[in-house]
Amino acid sequence: EPHVVCRRQRQMCIRDRNLPEKSIIPKNPIQAFFAFLLEDWADEWWWRTAMHYRWHYAEGAHFASRHLAEELLSSIPLPIWMKKIFLMRRQRNGYTTGDGITSKNLKTVEEDFLNLLNNLDKIFKNRKFLFGSRPSIADIGFSGPFFRHFALDPVPLEIIRQKAPNVLDWVSTLWKARLSELSDDFEEGIPNDLEPLFKEIGQVYLPYLSANVQAVKQNNKKFDFEFKDVSLRKARFLSLIHI
């Protein structure tokens, strides 16, 4: 079994062993390692950017807060506008400005998202999924921020439509995919067009995880992290990382 770094990935390994005909983990151990790495980066790094687009801009904040107010706070006897204000303040304080994204660094945060879209769009222009004609655990990792955030919320969705149509096609293809009906396998080796993603992981995400580990060891619930010209202050640690 490939080395995994969190409980979520352990569960996926167990699922893969029990359902070999629906495998999402490459049998090649090198492929599997890099697929797990992409899955972790996609799921644990990009949620902050997703929350920024959801709650920073008025269009996204009104869209999300109304949905949450109607779904989660329906039993509370308050006007819908009051529930929306509460939710917007709560989410911004907890997940955007309250988690290190400020007016000083949001330009770079958004540029990084555009860079991600550009890299993914080139990949999905050549093939259906990250490692070939079959979805892998890496695709599942990216489905988290894309299914529920980037391709759902109005602001990032419009950016994807304009800048990365192949990514939007991938979202639809992955959603409709039935593993038991796919006879194609993963490509051999590591596709060259994944290199920009791994470069970004090495330059930003791995140092971020290292700072995260130090915070866990020191029992600090928040930590500071700097990358490029961004200074994340009081970022929350990821408690499921295994040291």
Where in this protein do the model-derived segments appear?
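Single conserved hydrophobic/aromatic residue that forms the stacking wall/gate
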Residues: 2-14, 242
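Buried hydrophobic packing segments
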Residues: 15, 38, 145-149
